[in-house]
A protein has these predicted regions:
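Charged, glycine-rich intrinsically disordered N-terminal tails and low-complexity linkers that flank
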Residues: 1-60
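Mg2+/Mn2+-dependent nuclease catalytic core
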Residues: 44, 51-55, 59-62, 66-121
Length: 122
């Protein structure tokens, strides 16, 4: 989970996870939701069960990715701002030399909406 400091900094940028809403393709939030979250004191959503499960699984999933794909020296919970577009940012579950790792948890029912059938990665 992000710290209060990280959450405060994120409010100053458009994050990668917010861009679908801004582009009008998110089924969960709208561009207006993002706008009001940025300009007001609206609190971020309270973590739900899926969010908490995903957070708990991040460390073992990153360890698995390191073993599976022969990755070393990954740094966890990395926040980056675009050099070319300073309004844009992203928070990565892990970063390494030339590689970014992002872990997502979905329920069995939600898994059908991710990736292509019979593929190991998304």
């Amino acid at each position: 989970m992000l710290t209060e400091k990280q959450l405060t900094i994120r409010r100053q940028h458009i994050g990668a996870s917010e861009s679908p809403a801004i582009c009008g393709v998110s089924p969960w939030q709208t561009a207006a939701d993002i706008y009001w979250r940025k300009v007001s004191d609206i609190a971020d959503d309270e973590p739900n069960e899926a969010m908490m499960t995903g957070h708990r699984l991040e460390k073992p999933l990153i360890e698995f990715a390191c073993e599976e794909f022969n990755l070393a020296g990954l740094r966890r919970n990395q926040f980056r701002v675009s050099k070319d577009e300073p309004l844009l940012s992203a928070t990565f579950d892990a970063l390494g030399d030339g590689v970014a790792v992002e872990c997502k948890y979905v329920s069995a029912a939600g898994a059908q909406h991710w990736g292509e059938p019979d593929r190991k990665s998304v």
